[in-house]
Each structure stands twice: as structure tokens, then as C-alpha cells.
């Protein structure tokens, strides 16, 4: 009985992780312009970008200042924190941020939905360009990293992990605020359509 439940749980978890209809699927469509490990990183960044952008669009403007507790980031601050990281972290591995950006204060710079979405979009474009610009030969190169040492390969892994952490945070926020993630809505619609077809 326990084995059966475990198998069902694994299937449900796996299906939930698969790209739904309408989502970016770099595992199938590829990552033009990059190869090897950088291609694997690019795929994860592309998926994160797609989900962040769709979630940011789905959150109503009046919810952008919502936060689950007084001492944590709001929706706006999470999205802008991710934007700042897409510049700051890639700058640490060799791709400077565009001049004129106030990265130290960007997180609290605005609560305007349209401006935040534009900032988030631009930051992911920068991140993808930075990955393309990295030579494969530099992946094992040692570098200073938060008071210690890391390789550029390890730094990219850190960046992917950081983005995933805040994507999960944003998904939890959206559920608490009564917003169903768009890809879940898509999956639910597809499931309902299949159920309706099976009854015909």
C-alpha cells in the first residue's frame, strides 16, 4: 500500500514539474547560442524567466505591495530583488550591468506593476546574454565569491538555485494572495477538456 502511494506521489510530482501547454520548453526546443553546461544553465534560466514573467502578469496591481508578514519582501520587492540579482550576480562572473542602473536601491524603487515587469524582462535578457558570452573554457576558472572561492561553473549553479528559491517564494505568495499560477490554470483547463472529451 505504501509503495503504491509512493508511486502515485512520484507521478503527480513529476507531472507537476513538466512544462504545461504554452510554457517555454527549452529541453525540447533547445537553447540556441550555447552548448554543454551553459546550455543546461540557460534552459533553467529560460524556464524561470517564463514562470516569473507569467506570474508577474497574473498578480493584480493592487497586490504588488502585499507581503505575508511585516518583515519580509512584498511581491514588488521579490520581483525587483530577482531583477537586481540578474545584474549583480552575472557582473561577478564577468558581464557588467548596464550603466545608469541603481542596483543598490532597485528593490524598493517602485511598486508600479508595468515598470516592474519591464525591469524583470530586461534583467532576464541581460542574464541570457551573459550566459552566451561566457567561454566554456572559463567554467573551471577560480574566482572570488562572497568571501570565499568558487568556479564560474559553481557560480552559475548558485545563480540558478537563487532564482529557483525566489520563484518558489513567489508561487507561495501567489497562493496565499489568492492567485493561481498561470501554468496551473493551463494544466487544469487541459485536464477539464480531456475529461469532457472522454464523456462525449
Model-derived features: positions:
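Bacterial N-terminal signal peptides
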Residues: 7-20
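Positively charged n-region of N-terminal signal peptides that target proteins for export
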Residues: 1-6
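Solvent-exposed, charged/polar functional surfaces in cytosolic regulatory/catalytic domains
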Residues: 51-54, 58, 122-130, 169
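Acidic/histidine-rich alpha-helical segments that form the ligand environment
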Residues: 108-144, 151-163
